[in-house]
């Protein structure tokens, strides 16, 4: 299991309740390597990263039964309610106009790779810079490609910055 994830919390419950042994890894990819080398019996990881690993490794499969479901969110300093409201408004707009669905479908499903997000021409970025923090090891949400952080989360963050007039760093 990847250290510090929801999967880690779930695996810890199993470890405490039925005596299972949980191996923790800094990256999901390290856990997958250990699985392929026969060092561990399974990997607990989110569905979409699991799907990405299975697509690259014919000898792996995803179990039919889900352990849990969860939702994701952006974190903003709780003292910055103005920015929180602006981001929420931008996300609502992006959901309503189909941008969020298009971003997700570019990474997940039958249309993967067919809808890359590109910023609209002429965006005024005079409102400053928003900084996104991530570990970029959680494909398709965020990962490195050609030494650049890419994925669903960076594309959504860029789309939010496009709506709000910020530079994304």
Where does each model-flagged region fall?
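Extracytoplasmic small-molecule ligand-binding "clamshell" domains
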Residues: 24, 86, 125-169
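Extended ligand-binding regions for polar small-molecule ligands
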Residues: 3-6, 51, 73-113, 154-158, ...
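Helix-loop-beta element that forms the nucleotide-linked donor phosphate-binding surface
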Residues: 14-18
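Short helix-initiation/N-cap motifs at beta->coil->alpha
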Residues: 22-37, 70, 154, 169
């Amino acid at each position: 299991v990847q250290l510090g994830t929801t999967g880690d919390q779930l695996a810890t419950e199993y470890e405490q309740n039925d005596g299972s042994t949980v191996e923790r890894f800094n990256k999901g990819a390290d856990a997958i390597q250990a699985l392929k080398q026969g060092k561990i019996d399974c990997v607990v990881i989110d569905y979409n990263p699991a799907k990405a690993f299975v697509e690259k490794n014919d000898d792996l499969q995803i179990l039919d039964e889900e352990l849990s479901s969860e939702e994701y969110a952006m974190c903003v300093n709780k003292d910055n309610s103005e920015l929180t409201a602006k981001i929420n408004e931008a996300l609502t707009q992006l959901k309503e106009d189909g941008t969020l669905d298009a971003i997700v479908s570019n990474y997940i499903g039958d249309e993967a790779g067919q809808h890359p997000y590109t910023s609209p021409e002429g965006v005024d970025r005079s409102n400053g810079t928003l900084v996104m923090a991530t570990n970029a090891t959680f494909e398709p949400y965020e990962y490195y490609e050609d030494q650049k952080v890419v994925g669903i989360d960076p594309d959504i963050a860029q789309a939010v910055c496009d709506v709000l007039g910020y530079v994304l760093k």
